Regions:
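Aromatic-lined substrate-binding rim segments of carbohydrate-active enzymes
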Residues: 83-143, 155-157, 218
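Boundary/entry segment of secreted carbohydrate-active catalytic domains
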Residues: 40-95, 99-101
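Active-site groove signature of glycoside hydrolases
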Residues: 133-143, 165-197
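Extracellular/luminal regions of secreted and cell-surface proteins that mediate adhesion/ECM remodeling
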Residues: 344-489
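Catalytic cores of secreted or luminal carbohydrate-active enzymes
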Residues: 309-361
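C-terminal motif of bacterial Sec signal peptides marking the signal peptidase cleavage site
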Residues: 17-20
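An active-site-proximal structural segment forming one wall of the substrate-binding cleft
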Residues: 114-131, 150-178, 200-213
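Catalytic-core regions of glycoside hydrolase
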Residues: 178-182, 189, 193-330
Length: 489
């Protein structure tokens, strides 16, 4: 475990140095309506078949979902075996923090053997149904002596390493929930660099290299909101994040590694004046509404100044749109949340929590014809899903064979916390679809082709089963049976 008390003493100083330096939504194929938008015009459907409407009820059950929630502290991804992280899923988590240790390569290129082991580690992560919060760094100090001697690499070496890692990141993006900045300074937290990498220009160079290495639809989370505010004074809009080519501001979020631990979160929001510090907090809240946030708590330097009560985490978890949080540190916070009776709510609300209200679809259709549909839901979590993911109707015949119909324009990142969302549209049926009766299911599979058929990576809706109506979550298939039918004739 890292030297958190030591980090507390240095991060504020580094943030002070930073301050001194001054240094279209994809809705094709669907009509969307939200509480804040003007009512959409009625969609004229080609189909005149009667509609089957399913009303659904929410559940308070706490269950795992991909790319959100508490994470467990793991190991360098090159060391992940086929069974080393099975306990994570068994304990109800779907995320692990994987610190890539580059301390042996500060002055040389990454060997092919290390890159190959990274691929193997990610393959093993995939086998265990998990995703990574990934960070690479050149040092992980645990004592004051470690910190005083902590070394990173030169800018040219860092850029070379990122270029070497690019193919690995591209190949394994499906199991990388988010990449944290890393590389610069102590713990890869973008402060206290032995190679003077914390100047605005050098930080920007590392930022650009990381964005180049990542697929455009994967997020980069950085440590200090002052960096983002300097580069992008106006936070990105949701439409930018949902575009096929999102700009840099729409690809970068924040990780706060001393969440709630002091008045300025141990330097996270350090500024010369209280007003400037509050401006950074406001910026972080606005930016995280689109690009999400995560991190961990840490040992408070002054326990009396930490915000450890249930009211604090419930208020600020929502305000900063927290998607993921370290479950292994700091235990003092978790003890307070347990004692205050909110730990279960925190676990449920980290990230997204999508409750379906109604699902409607045509009840009769022809092979090769169109099927009208509509979906109404709300997000009761603290954040949007971090990565692209859309809905699909699944038609299941009497033999259990399934036909999947992706619903265009239903990227679930559109689900704003606390607000209702409704889509409607038509979807084409396969021309070769056999006549007969089909059970209708709703699914939200992983967007990656390699994981789309893996039920472990499917998003589970926060809805209760109903034995009377036939609504039932199908864990082996990763989809929700609606209890409704479609007749194809």
């Amino acid at each position: 475990m890292r030297a958190w008390t030591l980090k507390c003493s240095v991060l504020a100083l580094c943030a002070a140095g930073l301050a001194a330096c001054g240094g279209g939504e994809d809705d094709a194929g669907a009509t969307q309506r939200t509480e804040n938008a003007a009512p959409a015009p009625t969609l004229r459907l080609a189909s005149v078949a009667p509609m089957a409407q399913v009303s659904l009820q929410p559940t308070d059950l706490d269950f795992p979902n991909p790319e959100r929630g508490f994470y467990r502290f793991a190991t360098d991804p090159s060391k992940i075996t086929a069974t080393s992280l099975l306990y994570v899923a068994q304990e109800g988590q779907r995320l692990v923090y994987t610190p890539g240790d580059l301390s042996a390569y500060r002055t040389r290129n990454l060997p092919a053997s290390y890159l190959s082991k990274l691929d193997t580690g990610f393959a093993n992560l995939r086998k265990q149904g998990l995703k990574a919060v990934l960070r690479f760094a050149y040092n992980y100090p645990e004592t004051e002596a470690d910190y005083l001697n902590a070394q990173d690499a030169t800018l040219s070496r860092v850029k070379t390493h990122i270029q070497q890692l690019q193919p690995v990141l591209q190949r394994n993006a499906d199991v990388i929930a988010v990449l944290q900045g890393g590389f610069i300074g102590a713990w890869g937290e973008w402060h206290t660099s032995s190679n003077n990498l914390t100047t605005p220009a050098r930080k920007a160079a590392v930022r650009d290299a990381l964005l180049q290495a990542l697929p455009s639809q994967r997020l980069l989370h950085l440590r200090l909101p002052a960096d983002l505010a300097l580069w992008y004074p106006t936070p990105a809009a949701l439409a930018q994040a949902l575009s096929d080519a999102p700009p840099p501001a729409a690809r970068i979020g924040l990780h706060n590694d001393c969440f709630l631990a002091s008045p300025d979160d141990v330097g996270t929001y350090f500024a010369e004046t209280a007003a400037q510090s509050q401006a950074l907090r406001t910026y972080a809240q606005q930016a995280s509404a689109v690009t999400g946030a995560g991190g961990e708590t840490c040992e408070p330097p002054e326990p009396a100044q930490a915000r450890m009560a249930c009211a604090d985490i419930l208020r600020e978890g929502a305000a900063y749109h927290m998607s993921y949080l370290n479950r292994d540190y700091y235990e003092g916070f978790f003890a307070q949340w347990q004692a205050g009776g909110c730990m279960a709510e925190v676990s449920r609300r980290l990230g997204y929590r999508l409750e379906l209200q109604t699902v409607s679809h045509g009840s009769i259709a022809a092979p090769g014809g169109t099927l009208a549909w509509s979906v109404a839901l709300s997000n009761q979590g603290w954040a949007r899903p971090l990565n692209p993911r859309s809905l699909a109707l699944v038609l299941v015949d009497a033999q259990g064979q399934a036909a999947t119909l992706p619903l265009a324009g239903t990227d679930l990142r559109q689900a704003t916390p606390g607000e209702p969302l409704q889509w409607s549209g038509e979807v084409a049926l396969p021309a070769a679809l056999a006549s007969g009766s089909y059970q209708v299911h709703l699914a939200a599979p992983d967007a990656a082709a390699a994981l789309a058929g893996n039920a472990t990576y499917a998003l589970r809706f926060a809805n209760a089963d109903n034995a009377v109506t036939g609504v039932q979550w199908q864990p082996a298939q990763g989809r929700l049976a609606l209890g409704s039918t479609l007749t194809v004739q």
